[in-house]
Amino acid sequence: VDITAIAAASHEVGAQVVVDNTFLSPLLQQPLSLGADVVVHSTTKYINGHSDVVGGVAIAKDPALAESLVWWANCLGLTSGAFDSYLTLRGLRTLAPRLRAHQENTDRILAFLQQQPLVKKIYHPSLPSHPGHEIARRQQSGFGAMLSFELDCSEAGLRTFLAALTLFSVAESLGGVESLVAHPASMTHRAMTPAAQQAAGISAQLLRLSVGIEHGEDLVADLAQGFEQAQLAQQAEQVK
């Protein structure tokens, strides 16, 4: 989304703009400089980066608002524990090299997915076909390591693909050093009705990848053997 345009329109009517910047981290996008009033991050994800912390931060541009948020956080007990804070700060030290590895692997996987006959559509802002590509190029310094794609296969083929993966773990989280795959329709967005999922563009064949920092060749090989097994499952169904 165009943060600058949204912020300008919001400020005209006296509204404040809060941006969740979790998927990109402060290294790839700085919403406050684009006009946002508050930026939030799930520190559980890229900032910590090792999937061993649950936490979050809210950063306000206005010092008075920031002071008010601190006051309420203390009153309500919303502050992190000492050890969680230590782990988060320790992870933050390696954010830059981790993000480089995340993005390099993502680029490699995107190139691979575009050659796969079982892949019907790919969603990632680095692709010119993505509706937000130009906005992302303008306001980000990188495109991130979250991507999704739709398989052109049956439910049995999809299940076979997921079961065949060994490096990608089936899980809902994201932003850690390990690679994860999720099936939004039955996991993150399961509470939505089928009609609501369809309206949101969440098909039964949609998969989401959080690309980790393992060796890129190994990740591609893992996906390749998953597609191979899914193809065999498809062929077996056709024989029946």
Question: At which residue positions do the language-model features occur?
Answer:
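Conserved PLP-enzyme active-site core in the AAT-like
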Residues: 1-118, 123
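Active-site beta-loop-alpha junctions enriched in small/polar residues
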Residues: 22-24, 127, 152, 212-214
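FAD-binding core of FAD-dependent oxidoreductases
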Residues: 46-48, 52, 173-181
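Short, flexible turn/loop "capping" segments at secondary-structure junctions
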Residues: 49-50, 80-82, 139-142, 199-204
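Short, solvent-exposed beta-strand edge segments and adjacent coil->beta transition regions
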Residues: 53-55, 142-146, 204-208
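Short, well-ordered beta-strand elements within core beta-sheets of diverse protein domains
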Residues: 88-97, 144-152, 208-212
